[in-house]
Amino acid sequence: MEEEPLLAGSINQGSGDYGAHSESCLHYPDEHTPRSRRLSYSVTDDSCNVEEDADADLYVQQAVVFIEDAIKYRSINHRVDSGSLRLYRWYYSNLCQWGLGLTIAVVLALAFIERPSSLTYTSDIRVKPKPWEPPCGMTEGIEIVCLCIFILDVTAKGYLIGWEEFRMNKWLLAYLIVITASVIDWMLSISMLCDENLRVRRLIRPFFLLQNSSLMKKTLKCIKRTLPEIASVILLLALHICLFTMIGMLIFAKSDDPKQNGEWQTYFRNLPKALSSLLVLLTTANNPDVMIPAYSLNRGYSIFFILFSVFGTYLLMNLMTAIIYNQFRGYLLMSVQTSIIRRRLGIRAAFEVLCCPGRGHTSTQAEGHVERVAVSMFLKVMERVHMKSYCRQAIVKAARRFPDGFISGEDFQRLFNELDKDFVKEHPPKPEYSSSGLQHIQYVYSHYYISVLGNAVALANVICICTVLVLNAEKSASEKNYFYMEIINCIFILYYLIEMLLKIVAFGWKGYLSYRNNIFDGFLTVLLLAIQIVIFITFKIPYVDVDPVPRHVMALWEMIRLVNMLIVFRFLRIIPEIKLMAVVASTIVDLVKNLRAFAGILLVVYYMFAVLGIWLFQGAISPPSNMSLVSNSSLENITGPYSMECGTFEQLEYWPNNFDDFASSLILLYNIMVVNNWHVFTDAYARYTTDWSLVYFVVWWLTSSVMWVNLFVALILENFTYKWDRSNGLSVEDVERIAYQSTVQLMFKEHVKEPTEEELLAQLHQHPHLHLSW
């Protein structure tokens, strides 16, 4: 994931006095020039030759930081003096960044224990006990510690980039405003003894997560630019719904015959009801319910609903998916372009600062500009760079191959192409045996068909379990005969154990563990064997003589059920053996690895809507005062907003779905995002509160189900298409290696325009703290 860039906005050429303190390498512009950078850093042949030894470590330190910036796609526009670079590296160290991430997680998790607390075993408002409420000052104390850490965070960022750049960075200014607002709201809470009804800071807490990720900010920017195209389709959808609403109200108008008023009474009674009915039909959540009253009178009425669904659900909604895919892919490509430029710029900056004369270099004397870097100096830098060990080894290995001992600018850039590649583990060689028997075992159990046989045995085991489950489906735990099931399990587990041991003999211990499939199989086999031994020791043999005490029977059944679940789970070993399934599994892994930013923004949206839902609807739905798990028929005589009609909130017993605490709010929002029966929630909250509550749910549906789900589908298509195209012509064993180049940047590499050397040098000239002159 890209880390937070210290400068995302434009660069002010007249920024203040931030730079290196080594006077031998300083470049002094005209002192009469307003806002000149008197301490800006420059590299010139004469000055660097004077105090070469004193400045050598600074140059190396600068190159190290610039390379680390390139690795993480960070901006290089920060201070470059020795003290600032040490602070900068400490700030972006794993310890500091993990600490900041933990702080963000803690401040977001406070919503689960703050009032209204989610610390109950159930969210069903009929039986929900009174939750534990933290004493006043407990969560506030944790929160103020987190806010102090955020203050230190924004202070460090402001110092490292300088005030001129800080005030032009909208994200950092917003960060400062959010911290200030949170502190003020926190002080109000303390002054009111935690008895306030509204905590504004809860709504803006997700900003801390958002601002800490460069990828999230880029994704949000892409979504913002895609909104106009999405809005045009939403407007067309609104026109489509309104048009069919008016036609529907004309077709299904109230008749003098009460028997023909079923459609009007239920779905087209008034304009808001008709609009909401067709909006829900657009998501197919109430299909064919909305059509049945009219369809039962005349089959011709079905044409109206079919036309509405065809044009709305299947044309316009899929058109929106296509637009989101097309537009967002373009903007994501622009974001990737920016990331590539940052990487190239950071690497070029490292090359330039290492080109100071006098430290193992060559230069073009006609121009006085250094063109090459000594390999020895480069290796010294690479020893101090924090990066993945396999990338470092690959880069160092490639650098040692230069015959003349020098690296040009183009070769310097090319060395770091290894950063885009994931590590592909090489399997260790098989052990050599002198015994013919062991050699025969090695030949047989290292063959591909042994894996096929193992998959067939696993399939047979699953089929046996399914057969037993079908035969015992109607039996209780005390009625089941566990003897035959355990005999079957023991036979298969014994085969799994023998297979594992012989594979270890064939591949060797290290070779066996070098395959992820073997690790998966071996772990489950050992676990199954351990559970089976526990069953033998605890319940003895035969199982038909198990003590009929229900407690013992249930304990045995639970352990056997655990064994069966592990055996079924072990059957997932077939996924890497089938090419299409391997590609799908690889796509899922890449989505988790590369698209975390999208999940992060979805978390932000969920968090904000959950807090807003608590504000608007907390306690809105409540069961009858004398209700305690009463039957459905007892509600029929109760007046008020309650309804026991078929398909209503009360009849379906959706009581656990509410906005009475943060955890239940998240679950309710998820249920609405899935859109199955989401009209049940909108109808209930409209009855218990007001019809305007529909606005909240429609906005959530548009945000989550329409925009975000379509966006996620589009990105899955892009990722899968990329993987599938690269997998054509590969064998099953090679599919796993597709992940060797699987970053988002490389997905769009062929469409990205590489920056030219002139463009990179021009941007380096605009660096606010590093003034390079040739």
Curated annotation (Swiss-Prot):
Cellular component GO terms, alphabetical: late endosome membrane; lysosomal membrane; lysosome; monoatomic ion channel complex
Topology class, membrane: Multi-pass membrane protein
Subcellular location: Late endosome membrane; Lysosome membrane
Intramembrane bits: 268-292, 659-681
Membrane-spanning intervals of the chain: 93-113, 141-161, 171-191, 198-218, 233-253, 303-323, 453-475, 487-507, 519-539, 565-585, 597-617, 697-717
SUPFAM superfamilies documented for this protein: Voltage-gated potassium channels
Catalytic reaction equation(s): Na(+)(in) = Na(+)(out); Ca(2+)(in) = Ca(2+)(out)
Gene Ontology MF terms in the entry: identical protein binding; intracellularly phosphatidylinositol-3,5-bisphosphate-gated monatomic cation channel activity; ligand-gated sodium channel activity; NAADP-sensitive calcium-release channel activity; phosphatidylinositol-3,5-bisphosphate binding; voltage-gated calcium channel activity
Annotated spans, Interaction with phosphatidylinositol 3,5-bisphosphate: 217-221
Glycosylation site list: 626, 632, 637
Pfam family, one: Ion_trans
Keyword Calcium: yes
Modification(s) after translation: N-glycosylated.
GO biological process: calcium-mediated signaling; endocytosis involved in viral entry into host cell; regulation of myotome development; skeletal myofibril assembly; smooth muscle contraction; sodium ion transmembrane transport
Keyword set, alphabetical order: Calcium, Calcium channel, Calcium transport, Endosome, Glycoprotein, Ion channel, Ion transport, Lysosome, Membrane, Repeat, Transmembrane, Transmembrane helix, Transport, Voltage-gated channel
Annotated domain remarks: Each of the two internal repeats contains five hydrophobic transmembrane segments (S1, S2, S3, S5, S6) and one positively charged transmembrane segment (S4). S4 segments probably represent the voltage-sensor and are characterized by a series of positively charged amino acids at every third position.
Subunit field text: Homodimer.
Name of the protein this chain belongs to: Two pore channel protein 2
Organism, scientific name: Danio rerio
